[in-house]
């Protein structure tokens, strides 16, 4: 699956290698702009200053966890970034973690290590949801 080059993605992981692999996979899928953040706090700052079409994030990070980041992101006071689709990347995909992530508004869950094809499928589902939501809203304009 090829993603249009104008998409912007934010990759958040405290592990530099995991960030680099995820960013490379997004580029391979055709994502035009990939920004990397090494911590949850850095991701919050990035989301406050520029729009992203999707965010990939780790669940366990030392400063602000994935759960904490989702609580901030999905808060209505956070503004337009609140609607940013999120793919959780985790090596700890226990039932409790996945349920909690979904409750907090995570759109897709990928278990590390994942393939570029698996990431492409998750992106396709997210982009399909976004397109459907936009179509649904246009009916009421």
What are these regions (language model features)?
Residues 36-54:
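Acidic, metal-coordinating helix/loop segments flanking the phosphotransfer/catalytic sites
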Residues 68, 93-108:
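Alpha4 helix (beta4-alpha4-beta5 surface) of REC/receiver domains from two-component response regulators
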Residues 61:
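Receiver (REC) domain active-site loop signature in two-component systems and cognate sites
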Residues 16-35:
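Two-component/phosphorelay signaling modules centered on CheY-like receiver
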Residues 39, 65-73:
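Acidic catalytic/metal-coordinating carboxylates
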Residues 114-123:
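C-terminal output helix
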């Amino acid at each position: 699956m090829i993603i249009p080059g104008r998409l912007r993605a934010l990759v958040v992981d405290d592990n530099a290698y995991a960030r680099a692999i995820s960013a490379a996979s997004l580029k391979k899928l055709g994502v035009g702009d990939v920004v990397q953040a090494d911590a949850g706090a850095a991701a919050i700052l990035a989301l406050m200053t520029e729009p992203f079409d999707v965010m990939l994030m780790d669940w366990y990070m030392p400063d602000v966890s994935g759960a904490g980041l989702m609580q901030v992101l999905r808060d209505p006071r956070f503004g337009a970034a609140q609607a940013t689709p999120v793919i959780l990347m985790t090596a700890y995909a226990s039932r409790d973690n996945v349920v909690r992530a979904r409750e907090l508004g995570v759109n897709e869950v990928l278990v590390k290590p994942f393939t570029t094809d698996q990431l492409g499928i998750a992106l396709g589902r997210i982009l399909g949801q976004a397109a459907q939501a936009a179509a649904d809203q246009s009916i009421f304009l």
